[in-house]
C-alpha cells in the first residue's frame, strides 16, 4: 500500500474534470495537498491517529470545496478509511491483550504501538469519527442475524463493543469509498489507476471481514478484488495475483467448512497461486543468471538469491497446502479446534483460531510483498448503503 503516497497526484488528471468540481483556488488545493502529505508521513510512521486527523481535515476542506458527493473526495476518503482500519486494528490488539482476546489478523504483518485517543474536530457539523458511525440497532457486526448471537453480543463487555464499533466506522468509510471509486471507474473506463484502486478497496474490505472472522463476506470481497486485479496485471507472473488467490482460498476454506465445495474452490485458488509463483520463480532465476554473467555486484546478487529462497519456500508451502486440501488433511479450523480440545480449552475464546488465521494471512501478504519490492516505477505509480460487513449486499 505504499503507492498511496502518490494517490492524489495520480488521479488529478481524471478527477479534475468531474462535473461537480467548483474550481478551487490554488491556495485551497495546496492546503489539501499539504494536509495529505502530512497524513502520508504520519501513516508511514504508523502514527495512525495523526494520519486520521490530517486526512480528516483534508476531507473537510475537499467537501467544502467540491461538495460531499463529489468524486474529488474519493482519494482522501480512501486514505482516511485505511487509517481508521489501522486504528481499529490497534485498538483491537490493545483490548485483546487486556481481555485475553484474539490476536489481530494484521498483527502478523505489522507491529503497533499503543494508540492514543483520536483527535476530535468538526466535519459537516459532526465529529468526523462519528460521521460514518452505524446506528447500533442496524449494525450487523454488533447484532448478527441469529437471536442467540444477538443475546451474546448484547452481553458482551463494553470494551468488546468498542472494538466492534471501530471496525464498523472503518467499514462504513471504506464502503463509501468503494461506491465512489466504482463511479470513478465508470467515469474513466480506460484508467488503469482507477481499476487498481477499486481492487485495493475490495481487498481491504476483505481483510476487514477476515479480521472479524466474517469469512463469507471476505470471500465475496476478495473474489471481486481478484477479478479487478486480473484485469490490470499480467496474470501469469505477478505475485500480487498469487497473493490475491491465496487470500481468497483462505476465506473460502473458513466459509462453512462443512461444505466440501468450498474446500474444492479453495484448492483451485491455491493451485493458481502456486502456478503464478512458479512463473515468477523461473523469471527470477533467469534474472540471477543474467546478472551473474554480467558481473553485477555481490550485494545485488545476494538480494536476488535471498528472494529466490523466499519464493521457493512459499512455493513449497503452497504445494503442501494443495495436497492437504485435496487429500482431506484437517482444515486449519479443524486442526485448531482439535488442539484446543486436547488441551481442554474449548471453554475459552477463539484466540487460537484467530492466530492461525493471522499466520495464514501473513503468508498471503508475503507473496505480494516480494513483488512490491521489485516492481518498476510505473507499476508503483499505477498502484498508487449502509449495511455492515457481517451480511451486507453492496449497493451503488
Curated annotation (Swiss-Prot):
A GO biological-process term: DNA replication-dependent chromatin assembly
Gene Ontology MF: a single term: histone binding
Highest rank taxon of the organism: Eukaryota
Biased composition (Low complexity): 343-353
GO cellular component terms, semicolon-separated: chromatin; nucleoplasm; nucleus
Record-linked SMART domains: TPR
Chain segments carrying region Disordered: 1-31, 135-164, 284-307, 334-396
Protein name: NASP-related protein sim3
Species of provenance: Schizosaccharomyces pombe (strain 972 / ATCC 24843)
Organism taxonomic ancestry: Eukaryota, Fungi, Dikarya, Ascomycota, Taphrinomycotina
Chain's gene name: sim3
